[in-house]
Amino acid sequence: MGKQVTSNGKQFLSKADILGQQDMVMEDLFVPEWDAWVKVKVMTAAERDHFEASTVQREGKKTSLNLQGIRARLCILCLVDEDGHRMFSDEDEYALGTKSGAALDRIFSVAQRINGMRDEDVAALAKNSDGAPAEDSPFD
């Protein structure tokens, strides 16, 4: 079953169309600190949910941001090999976090951009239930 055209000319995707979309964008990035290239990918919705859940900490009505290892956590989800498979597991957070901050910043910036992560998105995550202002964003 393909796209359905309605009487007003709009084309709507079917379930099969949506699930069949090849929408995982990847970008090559040269990292001078390592004198090599890496491949950075867009996260799946599940990976983005995982990243956001690992970034926000809730205690009762209080919400705060967990910035510890944020660069490594995002890079773990977005660094892939040439075939698009993740290179790192969640358990590699500490090890990756010991690498060059400048190198991880480069990768983090590209991952942030291609995943559409804006300061407003993080601020919305950090807001607590009473509408108090969010803490400073880690995505500067």
Name what the model sees in each region.
Residues 1-25, 139:
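Extended acidic low-complexity intrinsically disordered regions
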Residues 2-5, 30-140:
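Short, surface-exposed, charged amphipathic helix/loop patches that serve as local interaction elements
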